From Swiss-Prot:
Keywords: Pyrimidine biosynthesis, Transferase
GO biological process: 'de novo' pyrimidine nucleobase biosynthetic process; 'de novo' UMP biosynthetic process; glutamine metabolic process
Matching InterPro entries: Asp/Orn_carbamoyltranf_P-bd, Asp/Orn_carbamoylTrfase, Asp/Orn_carbamoylTrfase_sf, Asp_carbamoyltransf, Asp_carbamoyltransf_Asp/Orn-bd
Protein name (record): Aspartate carbamoyltransferase catalytic subunit
Gene: pyrB
Organism the protein comes from: Leptospira interrogans serogroup Icterohaemorrhagiae serovar Lai (strain 56601)
Length: 308
């Protein structure tokens, strides 16, 4: 098939054939890594890692992905360590980055910032999270994780639990799941419900959606996607304190499930996912992080036009 996505900015850009192609290529990359044959695919290429908002997993995952492909990385972390702190615009920053690197990965607290970045340059740009907007590479690795863990997506029931209002990983993954025959449970307090714009975007697709405040809905789900309450997005800290502990996933809840509920979490976790879940075989969130490296290795290659 013809895959034509130099930039990875949001999940709306991907069709079902695109996703089928990506899943297949990630499988190929996973085998290459297992056989120690991936190193050297991007030799001579330079990645600019631009993280203007806190990150551990995504930043290290992208940098590890580039290094494992034989490429190199230059980076900046936080506004205080960049010329943006001096008043430089994101546009100007990107024009400078274009002179140094072959591809850029950017995380920024402002929704839509990745589009500004991509519009400024000719090199590929990958969105690693833009405020409460989207996190497309996380969604792709989440999709791959579910398929790897469950064998399929069609026919599954997936629960999203926690902060559905500000959770960009949820926004992105739901956009991808509309291409599959799935049933969604949205489990959150009303104050943190999925924005109406995302619900409307699901209309006309074959999935079904149900909203509830009952955490026990997890018992009927094949997958439980848990997220932390996004403290940094709340304009009112008292509101965060009131809501932060309303939904908690623990071992007792998961063991009571009618299905072998696979537990996912984009991490970091705070109080919403108990550590007593970690030793369950269906706790997949650390495997999820591992799938992230091969997924991002694949996306880096495809954005740079390098087949494998």
């Amino acid at each position: 098939m013809y895959y034509n996505h130099k930039n990875v900015l949001d999940t709306e850009q991907f069709s079902k054939p695109d996703l089928d192609f990506l899943i297949g290529k990630i499988r190929v990359m996973e085998r290459l890594v297992e056989q120690n044959k991936a190193f050297g695919i991007l030799t001579g290429k330079l990645l600019a890692s631009l993280f203007f908002e806190a990150s551990t997993r995504t930043r290290l995952s992208f940098e590890a992905a580039m290094e494992r492909l034989g490429g190199r990385v230059i980076s900046t972390v936080g506004f205080q360590f960049s010329s943006i702190s001096k008043g430089e615009t994101l546009y100007d920053t990107m024009k400078m980055v274009e002179a140094y690197a072959d591809i850029a990965v950017i995380r920024h607290p402002v929704e839509g910032s990745s589009r500004i970045a991509a519009g400024a340059v000719k090199i590929p740009v990958i969105n690693a999270g833009d405020g409460a907007g989207q996190h497309p590479t996380q969604a792709i690795l989440d999709l791959y994780t579910i398929i790897s863990e469950k064998g399929t997506l069609d026919g599954l029931t997936v629960a999203f639990i926690g902060d559905l209002k500000y959770g960009r990983t949820i926004h992105s993954l739901i956009n991808l799941l509309r291409h599959y025959k799935v049933r969604l449970f949205l489990i959150s307090p009303p104050e943190l419900a999925l924005p109406e714009s995302y619900k409307k975007a699901l209309q006309g697709y074959s999935l079904t959606l149900e909203e509830t405040t009952d955490i026990k809905a997890v018992w009927d789900c094949d997958v439980a996607y848990v997220t932390r309450i996004q403290e940094e997005r709340f304009p009112d800290h008292k509101e965060y304190e009131r809501l932060k502990d309303l939904f908690k996933i623990n071992k007792e809840l998961i063991l009571a499930s009618k299905k072998e509920t696979t537990v996912l979490h984009p991490l970091p976790r705070v109080n919403e996912l108990s550590t007593d879940v970690d030793d369950l075989p269906n706790a997949a969130y650390f495997r999820q992080a591992r799938y992230g490296v091969v997924s991002r290795m694949t996306l880096l290659c495809l954005s740079l036009g390098q087949d494998f």
